[in-house]
Amino acid sequence: MTYLQEASRNAVTVPKLQAMRDAGEKIAMLTCYDASFAALLDRAGVDVLLIGDSLGNVLQGQTTTLPVSLADIAYHTASVARARPAALIVADLPFGTYGTPEDAFRSSVELMRAGAQMVKLEGGEWLADTVRFLVERSIPVCAHVGLTPQSVHAFGGFKVQGKTEAGATQLLRDSLAVQAAGAQLIVMEAIPTLLASDATKQLRIPTIGIGAGLDCSGQVLVLHDMLGIFPGKRPRFVKDFMQGQPSILAAVEAYVAAVKDGSFPGPEHTF
């Protein structure tokens, strides 16, 4: 059995994401961990596939993303890449793998060799030198600000960020700093809608929201969440797109359409 498919659309590249942002076309992003789903998500028109350290939660049963290793991410990145999707492949740098610019470079090289076309790392202003170090060495970078799950213990739990004036000011500083360092994409997680809107207006690069409101350049969800596969209470920023759909493909197509036409997220999914 093969998961390869003939390309039905042009490849989504880093410059393509910038062009989409500049043209006002929303970017649809989902997590992905294997070849089968990579082919399906690509067929549904997803623009970006994220091999997220969320695999620690949804695949490994961990309560946080902290136990996920670089080898874990590399393995799943290679699995996704074998499907040869037109979608851009972005891979997370796990906790503890980018403490210095040199560490980040070594880790990123492993993920790029596995098939990643961009790496994502959590943090803002303090990571500017690392972002610059990677970009200067031809590694595209996606930054992640707001609620950064690898900082769960520092935050005291999974809490909305940027609610205070000081917090909002720092988030804007973080976003502008990583952009100045060369980041080409930025994920904003669990921050007030107005703050995400303000940041998106101030930034030149695309912003991808998850619990950050409608005004971001695009949206991302964990694949399992948007298919209704989550134990316990549904996170506020999640919509179950599987409801009322005849197939997983149809559910993913509905997600892509909702992101593109601006009907997702709704007010009930934001802070």
Swiss-Prot record:
One of its GO terms (molecular function) is magnesium ion binding. This is 3-methyl-2-oxobutanoate hydroxymethyltransferase. Pathway: Cofactor biosynthesis; (R)-pantothenate biosynthesis; (R)-pantoate from 3-methyl-2-oxobutanoate: step 1/2. HAMAP family: PanB (MF_00156). GO terms for biological process: pantothenate biosynthetic process. Belongs to the PanB family. CDD domains: KPHMT-like. It is an enzyme of class 2 (transferase). Binds 1 Mg(2+) ion per subunit. The gene is panB. Catalyzes the reversible reaction in which hydroxymethyl group from 5,10-methylenetetrahydrofolate is transferred onto alpha-ketoisovalerate to form ketopantoate. It comes from Paraburkholderia xenovorans (strain LB400). GO terms for cellular component: cytoplasm. Its EC number is 2.1.2.11. The lineage of its organism: Bacteria, Pseudomonadati, Pseudomonadota, Betaproteobacteria, Burkholderiales.
